[in-house]
Swiss-Prot record:
The keyword Iron does not apply. PANTHER family: U1 SMALL NUCLEAR RIBONUCLEOPROTEIN A/U2 SMALL NUCLEAR RIBONUCLEOPROTEIN B. It comes from Zea mays (Maize). It comes from the Eukaryota. This is Protein MATERNALLY EXPRESSED GENE 5. CDD domains: RRM_AtNSRA_like. Belongs to the MEG family.
Amino acid sequence: MAGYGVDGQRMMGVVGMDSRGMGYGGRPEPPLPPDASSTLYIEGLPANCTRREVSHIFRPFVGFREVRLVNKESRHPGGDPHVLCFVDFDNPAQATIALEALQGHVTDDVNVSAPAEEGILREKRAQCAQGFLPCKDNKCYCCIGGRTHDCYYTMAQCSHACF
């Protein structure tokens, strides 16, 4: 049927006066880097969060596909496990809209046993550690680890310059 995507959701866009695409809801689509990904990496989730809880946060966004959680053991003896979270969208523009809307979103403000940093979503575009990941002002200062990517916003915070 014309105007509908494979999954039955209506697919439409409008061109704005400056020829930029207008995304869903009439909002201009954000400018995207050429290597933009449709997958977001979420950090700051509590160790006991579930896939269902994270899905509940992202489900209202157009293009949401799925959440993948990976539990990793702590690098420190006796430390809490670390949760890696990846959220997939249909396209990079939809991922960017969710990223901008939820940056710094508080997920668990009652969990007193959680460290102060835990419970605040910090989102980044998921990308291979081989490449650079624009986090703040399109600058990435550090790649750490083989498959993970930690981003530091200033050179002073980074001890492993990767550029």
